[in-house]
């Protein structure tokens, strides 16, 4: 990365007119690809049936097709929330989806409103992950489920040519203050939390982990001895590229601490 250029781009993205213009060209995960949306829905539905459920999806970007599939499969209601308006409230309403924008902190939703919360490759972009995880716990009903797939890679490397597979976690080379100075205002920002840090956040919020599935980067594992910037992490944290979790809000608060 050319650090001065990265910092300048980040500063420019702090101006609303420029950010709004750039938003038109954002790639947000599924990008309304119906086939991909169906696969993500099947992933979610494999953890818990959607029939009769009130569902919230966090960070859908341009893709409301996953929630449309949920409604077609028997969900009672579907709500989407994001930090940027990738579609309008009216467009979502036509699909029978309630659409909200939030500030990345408090969810403008009632406590105990949902049975299911979904998120696909969005949590890694959270600027305030501990706050949002706590908010997920608040808006879930007791016995409710959170399913999230979190991509732990450096998103600024995605889509580039001549990128080595060993650069998957290149973002971890930089101290937090410098990373934030380069990326905070940009869609390629990631919070760089590792698997164990996510699991700690979920536990501290009160969730019970029902399932946790990890994908390992074989490329990183094969060259790990040479990647000294990763040596401060445990082996699991150093090589895990994706973690998918299924979490439950306990029926009784006492169960969360057991």
Please name every model-derived segment.
Residues 130-145:
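A short glycine-rich, Lys/Arg-flanked "PGG" loop and its adjoining helix->strand segment in the class I
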Residues 180-196:
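Acceptor-substrate binding/catalytic loop of class I
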Residues 65-105:
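Class I SAM-dependent methyltransferase SAM/SAH-binding core
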